[in-house]
Amino acid sequence: MYYKEGCATLQTKPQKQVLGILGGLGPAASCYLYQMLIDHTPATCDQDHIDIVISSRASTPDRTAFIMGKSKDDPFAVMEQDGFSLVHYGATVLAIPCNTAHYFYDRLAEALPDRKSV
């Protein structure tokens, strides 16, 4: 049970899905997505917002350098580990705001098969 300011009664809090943001792969992209989610959520109080867990590991190896063959340092292992961490912390749906990180989408989807979306 929780009390929502402005409501006359206690309500049973509905079970929410939790969004996991696989971020830090360009921290500004993660920040931009988070700000857009806040700005476009029709919330009248903090509790009306989407539950979100964000990983932001800026030290992840450079995706573009790996994709272009300029680095052998594959960022996938870090992305996979962060994906599992997000799931561990309750994420039921994952989002990846970094454009170049989508190169690894198929591998992530295979590694995290129980997620509704990656």
Residue map of PLM features:
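Non-catalytic positions within long, well-ordered alpha-helices that form the structural scaffold/packing
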Residues: E80, F84-G90
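Periplasmic-binding protein-like
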Residues: L22-G24, T92-C98
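N-terminal glycine-rich anion-binding loop in soluble enzyme alpha/beta folds
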Residues: Y2, L10-A77
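Conserved small/polar residues in nucleotide/adenosyl-binding loops
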Residues: V118
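Short Gly/Thr/Asp-enriched flexible loops that form oxyanion-binding sites at enzyme active sites
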Residues: T100-D114
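Short secondary-structure boundary/capping elements
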Residues: D74-V78, I96, T100
